[in-house]
Amino acid sequence: MQANDSSNKVVYWGTGRRKAAIARVRLVPGQGEVIVNGKPGEIYFNRIANYIQSLKAPLETLGLEGEYNILVNAHGGGLTGQADAVKLGVARALCQLSPENRQPLKAEGYLTRDPRAKERKKYGLHKARKAPQYSKR
C-alpha cells in the first residue's frame, strides 16, 4: 500500500514471510540504506554479504538500487528466514510502486513465497523423521 510518512514522503510497504520469520518492509525515497529493527542492515545481519545482497536483489533487478531506503521491522525465525522475508517484502513493495514492476520480479521468482517450513515432530520418533535405532534381535 501507499502511504504518506510524517515528512510527506511517499512510502511503499510490503510484508514478507519465510519459515517462522515475518518482515514488514517500507520503501522510502533515499540513498539505498537498509535499517532493520533500528540498526543498520550490515550490523543486524552480522556483515554477512549474502543476506544484504539477497534483500537488495529485487531493487537491482529493476535498476533502482540506491534510490530507496529499506526500513524493516522483522521478528521471528533466524537471520536466513528474516533475510528472505525482507526480500519478499521488498518485492511486494516494489509492486506497489508501479504495476509494471510485477512482471520482471515474477520472472526472477522474487514474488513467490517459499512454503518450506520445519516439519513437526511425530510421537514415537526422535525428530520429525529420525526413528529410534532398530535392533533385529
From Swiss-Prot:
The keyword Ribonucleoprotein applies. The gene is rpsI. GO terms for biological process: translation. This is Small ribosomal subunit protein uS9. Pfam families: Ribosomal_S9 (PF00380). Belongs to the universal ribosomal protein uS9 family. It comes from Synechocystis sp. (strain ATCC 27184 / PCC 6803 / Kazusa). Keywords: Ribonucleoprotein, Ribosomal protein. HAMAP family: Ribosomal_uS9_B. The lineage of its organism: Bacteria, Bacillati, Cyanobacteriota, Cyanophyceae, Synechococcales. One of its GO terms (molecular function) is structural constituent of ribosome. PROSITE patterns: RIBOSOMAL_S9.
